[in-house]
Amino acid sequence: MKRKLKVAIIGSGNIGTDLMIKILRHGEHIEMGAMVGIDAASDGLQRAARLGVVTTHEGVEGLSRMPVFADIDIVFDATSASAHTRNDAFLRAIKPGIRFVDLTPAAIGPYCIPVVNGERHLDAPNVNMVTCGGQATIPMVAAVSRVARVRYAEIVASISSRSAGPGTRANIDEFTETTSRAIEVVGGAAVGKAIIVLNPAEPPLIMRDTVYTLSEFVDERQIEESVTRMAEAVQTYVPGYRLKQRVQFDRIDADGPIRIPGISDRMVGLKTSIYLEIEGAAHYLPAYAGNLDIMTSAAKVTAEGVANRLLANKK
């Protein structure tokens, strides 16, 4: 029987619950050890208990007192940016070697986008999964930047209001700041900007994302091929990730430059527009919540890589 490492999830909201179900159903190198929350009546904790997962409603303090904590190697944090800073410090003081996969915008550790730089950070004590919008769009920015120098990249992430729980809503400012920075650090853009839209439409609409880049002039076919390959790579762990239409191009020359406030009044180059749609696997919330699915899928595949590395080192 294949050995698996035990994990704990902090945060029993939409993201934590969806992640728990993914691990229970599809964990390869990891298995559930504990589900941690602060509300005993939350659906996530109650569902975890029904599924046979050990739970606590006393936060990380409760987790540290649980017998299973001694066997926990990896902790997922699906709370908030401010809470994650405290959670990491508290648990690391007790267990210095513990690994964190951070699903908040706290960004204590390096940004991790599995298809772009996931292999690079398997030994990091704490990795940050950026944001749902970042997981969806940064691969596309990286796809452009690997064939052309990107001077500016802007992403717009539109998610169903119903899929945004209290944690997501509390992190809106951190969402834009963390995603913008990761567009630059991981995506390779000189300057990045992120916008999030909570769409109140009923019935809820599927997650849609738009990526704009302004790069040096190159053969458009190179960018289109790079984008297609990157989308296929993301689909290996998020099957519902897809290009909504063909990549669009606009050549902006010196006769008609564009102004980007705070960047330049006369920018020229190749404008690339990429339109994405992310359909969720409906493990917890319905398929419209692609924002949950891409975040939890990216976190799971990252933790699987970390666990595989740890298991190999223990042999």
Swiss-Prot record:
Active site, renumbered = C132
Question: What name is this protein filed under?
Answer: Acetaldehyde dehydrogenase 1
Among the GO molecular function terms of this UniProt record, one is: NAD binding
User: Which SUPFAM superfamilies did the record assign?
Assistant: Glyceraldehyde-3-phosphate dehydrogenase-like, C-terminal domain (SSF55347), NAD(P)-binding Rossmann-fold domains (SSF51735)
What's one GO BP annotation on this UniProt entry? Answer: catabolic process
Under Enzyme Commission nomenclature, its number is 1.2.1.10
Chain residues that bind NAD(+): S12, G13, N14, I15, S163, A164, G165, P166, G167, T168, R169, A170, N171, N291
Q: Which UniProt keywords apply?
A: Aromatic hydrocarbons catabolism, NAD, Oxidoreductase
Task: Identify its protein family.
Answer: Belongs to the acetaldehyde dehydrogenase family.
What reaction(s) does this enzyme catalyze?
Answer: acetaldehyde + NAD(+) + CoA = acetyl-CoA + NADH + H(+)
Enzyme class comes to oxidoreductase
